[in-house]
Amino acid sequence: MRLSKVSDIKSTGVSNYKNFNSKNSSKYSLMEVSKKNEKKNSLGAFHSKKILLIFGIIYVVLLNAYICGDKYEKAVDYGFRESRILAEGEDTCARKEKTTLRKSKQKTSTRTVATQTKKDEENKSVVTEEQKVESDSEKQKRTKKVVKKQINIGDTENQKEGKNVKKVIKKEKKKEESGKPEENKHANEASKKKEPKASKVSQKPSTSTRSNNEVKIRAASNQETLTSADPEGQIMREYAADPEYRKHLEIFYKILTNTDPNDEVERRNADNKEDLTSADPEGQIMREYASDPEYRKHLEIFYKILTNTDPNDDVERRNADNKEDLTSADPEGQIMREYAADPEYRKHLEVFHKILTNTDPNDEVERRNADNKEDLTSADPEGQIMREYAADPEYRKHLEIFHKILTNTDPNDEVERRNADNKEDLTSADPEGQIMREYAADPEYRKHLEVFHKILTNTDPNDEVERRNADNKELTSSDPEGQIMREYAADPEYRKHLEIFHKILTNTDPNDEVERRNADNKEDLTSADPEGQIMREYAADPEYRKHLEIFYKILTNTDPNDEVERRNADNKEELTSSDPEGQIMREYAADPEYRKHLEIFHKILTNTDPNDEVERRNADNKEDLTSADPEGQIMREYAADPEYRKHLEIFYKILTNTDPNDEVERRNADNKEDLTSADPEGQIMREYASDPEYRKHLEIFYKILTNTDPNDDVERRNADNKEDLTSADPEGQIMREYAADPEYRKHLEIFHKILTNTDPNDEVERQNADNNEA
């Protein structure tokens, strides 16, 4: 028992010893490895330092060699120039000697005089040689000193070198002025050759100062737009800065104004005097695409902003929880996406915005100081058009393009019109027929047209279902039809008059409804045919045709009598036909019945109480000025009939959807997509609360648009030139308003914000909204 225990003890001791040795050996091995690593690291650092030192030495040597070589080249250059100047001086001396010898030979007639002159010339030559030797030695000494100084000073005194050389040349000139004029010329040429380098150095900072001045000008406090109240001046400056802009601007301008003098000639020679070839929009667009593919890109961008038909929107609209189509009614979001895709677009949009808004404060000062206070040229597009014609005959083609788009008068239609039994203009005044042809050519077109139609009329059948099921019944504030339905319930008389007006605008004959149900295609074909509706109205009421034609003439100014007057007038620019008020006055004289019907239509639009009719008849001036003054009418109606305001507000809400309850509901709504930026009338209400003066200025703006100043009518009759200046001159009106009320500008900007929805707060609210689409 004991032995076994001892053996056990021994065995355990041996094992412990082995374990101890193994642990020590592992420790020593780790220490050795760490030491080796330290040695390697130190060697690596040492070698890297050596390499860095070697490269540094090489760099310093190369740099010194470069500097010395540069200095040596400069010294050689100056030595070469010095030797060249000396050689040129010797050449001039030799030439002078030859010329003096020739002159002396010609002048001396006798030998005695010749011998004396030779002696004199020898003496002079000796003197000149001595002077030359002295001047050469002085030149060498001075140039050597200059070269030494230049080498010691270095590159920083390049400009001083030119000055020293100039001083040397000037001293030589003073010494050699008496007999060496040609030598002075060569010296001057040499100095001029040296001057450009110094001048270049001095000119470099001047260019930078010019650029700095331009930066300062751009960073000036008045950044609004420098001649934005002078669109033509703005356009001219834009032309200078961006010639590409002129092409696009001219296209758009031609599209808007459509007043080529050649058209006037064609109109006179045509059999039908009412303007023939003003024509086929879509076909014209296709031809424009073929001739200028760049045009399509810009047109599509502008079209997207107006109609908001981005295909991505369509996808988002279908996936959205709220099916009311809010992204497509967000032009600002569309614009932002366009900016991201094409930053060049923003520049052109801003230029166009400046031309439209004309808000340069400097222009205001210039306008007041001008002799002619009406500022006619900038508000005289016809004069501008005439100048454009002279500068660019291509103008006509592009102008006709857009005019054809708006009026749909395809030349082929003109042929069909002449051959038709009914000469009343069937297809050319039938844009829906044009649409049907477009459907056949491009089925994609129909989808986009329907989307745009839904946005305007809010007639999505799904919306109707959602509206009925919704807890909040006021979702129809962006639904004018729902508003109309509520009005029908309150006032059945209203429905009759509204339906008449609605039929004229939308052509929704109940017979069409029957045809629509029976048609294979349920998407409403005949109700989108206003001309067919008009033809049926003609059959039912021939009186209607006469009045409709009169109203059409007032809008389009196509009275055949005007055509005769235009030919006989001394001024061929034709302003009587663009004078609808004069046209109305002539219509009154020819047909007093017309006035009654026109007043009915006017009442529907402006809510003119029949009691006003009595007041109008008793008025001293029988021309009906108050009816052409809606704001004055509204003010008088408010005083006489407070009930009037309610009806006017109802009609206003239908058009603009500005129920005050909507504002509250919008804030409480879960869907934050439409806060206040898509609600211009809510903006108006807030403006009223903050600034009651706003209403007055809004009325001023309305007068400018409609030109219904009673004084204008008097001035028009008394004016020598019958072109109707003041009434067709809204800018002159603006000038008078500015003189009377400088506060006007501020309020005009408010109105601009309402139209464009550019409140900075809206942008912040939009970004913070849960749904970031609008």
UniProtKB/Swiss-Prot annotation:
Residues 201-228 have a biased composition (Polar residues). GO terms for cellular component: cell surface; extracellular region; host cell cytoplasm. Keywords: Host cytoplasm, Malaria, Merozoite, Repeat, Secreted. This is Glycophorin-binding protein 130. It is found in: Secreted; Cell surface; Host cytoplasm. Residues 117-140, 174-198, 264-276, 314-326, 364-376, 414-426, 464-476, 513-525, 613-625, 663-675, 713-725 have a biased composition (Basic and acidic residues). Interacts with host glycophorin. It comes from the Eukaryota. A motif (PEXEL motif) lies at residues 84-88.
